[in-house]
């Protein structure tokens, strides 16, 4: 049995849902994969089309990841100015094997 491979999708308000759900569909099928949806605040998060993701974890509560994925979206500019989000990206990326983004 393969060891656990933690995939973290670091999302933010107005993320494009397809930029998250498309890669999730593929990466969740990796042997031993455990996908985590996380944001700075956790809880619920609204994507750019109004779709609401529930039970989003707080990035600060995620200890580590093997792959960090940052989806694109209409909230990208605001996300790039969010010091807390960028700090969590840096923290998780420091020990991740892969750091990826989608579209943006």
What would you call each of these model-derived segments?
Residues 1-99:
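Extended, subdomain-level signal for the structured scaffold at the beginning of enzyme domains
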